[in-house]
Amino acid sequence: LLMPVKPNDDRVIGCWCISRGYLCGCMPCKLNDDSLCGRKG
């Protein structure tokens, strides 16, 4: 099993880097999707 890798960008909250995007909980989302990824504005 592949373990989730936390991004080096601490502006991201509760997200893990999955290939080209983030996985927030069980919901895949785009890197630039602030609402789904919970990024700090």
Curated annotation (Swiss-Prot):
Source organism superkingdom: Eukaryota
Record key words, sorted: Disulfide bond, Protease inhibitor, Serine protease inhibitor
Cystine residue pairs: 15-26, 17-24, 29-37
Site positions (Interaction with trypsin): 20, 30
MF annotations from Gene Ontology: serine-type endopeptidase inhibitor activity
Protein purpose: Has two active sites that simultaneously bind and inhibit trypsin.
Protein name: Trypsin inhibitor
Organism annotation: Trichosanthes kirilowii
